Curated annotation (Swiss-Prot):
Family named by the database record: Belongs to the lyase 1 family. Argininosuccinate lyase subfamily.
GO-annotated molecular function: argininosuccinate lyase activity
UniProt signal peptide: none
Record keyword Cytoplasm present: yes
Lineage of source species: Bacteria, Pseudomonadati, Thermodesulfobacteriota, Desulfuromonadia, Desulfuromonadales
Full protein name: Argininosuccinate lyase
BP GO annotations: arginine biosynthetic process via ornithine; L-arginine biosynthetic process
InterPro entries tied to this protein: Arg_succ_lyase_C (IPR029419), Argininosuccinate_lyase (IPR009049), Fumarase/histidase_N (IPR024083), Fumarate_lyase_CS (IPR020557), Fumarate_lyase_fam (IPR000362), Fumarate_lyase_N (IPR022761), L-Aspartase-like (IPR008948)
UniProt-annotated location(s): Cytoplasm
GO cellular component: cytosol
Predominant location: cytoplasm
EC number: 4.3.2.1
Length: 458
């Protein structure tokens, strides 16, 4: 049994040693040390400003906390499981260092609003960093688009050849996805960036604190408006993991395409050696481990979202010990997203493109069939009739092992008398691409304009 029990005045028995270890969170919440100290310094200064504790105590507290911060960053601070969490590890060391003044730090504050503050401070910084990583990935995608703006490739639906597009257009599709991810992170930040400190355990405090002062000190534009909600709320963490799940889904989709494109069957791209591994038995192998692992880690983030949703789903107000389980899913999501984004932006930047293979594939699989139908529509044929005629032409080509470009005018006329000599110009891959000159389309003019617009941050 543990000899000393935290806040043990009400108890007659010490905490069981295994229970002490089981309930401790210091193993994972110690990463909040910087935010905990920063929040405590702001709280102490507010207590002094309001005359709640002597100014001399404030100075001792601030100096003591700064020394503890230095110790932690130097690696000389010994974290104790018996002190349960980062809050008590720091407060206990502070009291041991400066004496009675350290015991006054927690005046007007509960661990409930303290931990809510720490998590918000931590997540706020991480969202800013994650958004910067998204920007780097967008830049890498735009660079590939710029450098390969004339490269054509097949576009797919159902993973079957559909219509020819520009490779740059495909890259821009992911730019749009990641721009939305960035927007979701920025929107989430608005709800993270609210000060909960001052809510106390659940009902506020009897001391004349100044929450707005603390908010200003810590860079929060607003304070929470209900003490119960302040300590019960983990919506902001759920929202972040939800946004992260969508972000990882986009990375997973791109991963899947890079894996396919790098196969010998496609050979559209090649990933740099630094992002691939070999085989323990097959000497020829170059395995795309990085996109495969990111694809796998996507499920991990989904699991974190489900874990935290399940923790929160039946909790009565206000704080419950269940909520200690919020940190590991949150921290793991942050680490996974940051790592995935960082490795992806570098991998995309170093990726090699094979225009010849893409170009050959773009003209195969009857990719210009839609344009043949559109050609007939311009000649006065109803679209459904045009669709039927071109379908028959495709069937003819399949039966005779031909492509549409192999047909003679006489053969075209078998399917519609409206076909003329200009059909041959209308169904080249380049003509089909440039014909889609509408906003959002794959025409070169549109794609180049979109790249320029993205570069301007629009």
């Amino acid at each position: 049994m543990s000899k000393d029990k935290l806040w043990g005045g009400r108890f007659t028995q010490p905490t069981d040693a295994f229970v002490e270890e089981f309930t401790a969170s210091i193993q994972f919440d110690k990463r909040l040390y910087h935010q905990d100290i920063r929040g405590s310094i702001a709280h102490a200064r507010m207590l002094g400003k309001q005359g709640i504790i002597p100014q001399a105590d404030v100075e001792a507290i601030v100096e003591g906390l700064q020394q503890i911060l230095l110790q932690i960053e130097e690696g000389s601070f010994d974290f104790s499981i018996s002190l349960e969490d980062i809050h008590m590890n720091i407060e206990s060391r502070l009291s041991a260092r400066i004496g009675e003044a350290g015991k006054r730090l927690h005046t007007g504050r509960s661990r409930n609003d303290q931990v809510a503050l720490d998590i918000r401070l931590y997540l706020r910084d991480e969202i800013v960093e994650i958004t910067s990583y998204i920007d780097l990935l967008i830049d890498a995608l735009l660079t590939q688009a710029e450098e390969n703006v004339d490269v054509v490739m097949p576009g797919f639906t159902h993973l079957q050849t559909a219509q020819p597009i520009l490779f740059a257009h495909h890259m821009l599709a992911y730019v749009e996805m990641f721009k939305r991810d960035s927007g979701r992170m920025e929107d989430c930040l608005k709800r993270v960036n609210v000060l909960p400190l001052g809510a106390g355990a659940l009902a506020g405090t009897t001391f004349p604190i100044d929450r707005d002062y603390v908010a200003e000190q810590l860079g929060f534009p607003a304070i929470t408006r209900n003490s119960l909600d302040s300590v019960s709320d983990r919506d902001f963490a759920l929202e972040f993991i939800s946004a992260s799940s969508i972000l990882m889904m986009h990375l997973s989709r791109l991963s899947e395409e890079l894996i396919l494109w790098s196969t010998s069957q496609f050979k559209f791209i090649e990933l740099s050696d630094g992002f691939c591994t070999g085989s323990s038995i097959m000497p020829q192998k170059k395995n795309p481990d990085v996109p495969e692992l990111v694809r796998g880690k996507t499920g991990r983030v989904y699991g974190n979202l489900m874990a935290l949703l399940t923790v929160m789903k039946s909790l009565p107000l206000a704080y419950n010990k269940d909520m200690q389980e919020d940190k590991e899913p949150l921290f793991d999501t942050i680490d996974t997203v940051k790592g995935s984004l960082k490795v992806f932006s570098d991998m995309i930047r170093e990726m090699s493109i094979y225009p010849e293979a893409m170009g050959r594939a773009a003209g195969q699989g009857f990719s210009t069939a839609t344009d043949v139908a559109d050609y007939l529509v311009r000649k006065g044929v109803a679209f459904r009739d045009a669709h039927e005629a071109v379908g028959k032409a495709v069937a003819y080509c399949v039966e005779n092992e031909m492509e549409l470009t192999d047909l003679t005018l006489t053969e075209w006329e078998l399917f519609s008398p409206r076909f003329e000599q200009d059909i041959f110009e209308a169904i080249t891959v380049d003509a089909c691409i440039d014909a889609r000159n509408v906003p959002g389309g794959t025409a070169r003019e549109q794609v180049k304009g979109e790249i320029a617009r993205c570069r301007k941050g629009k």
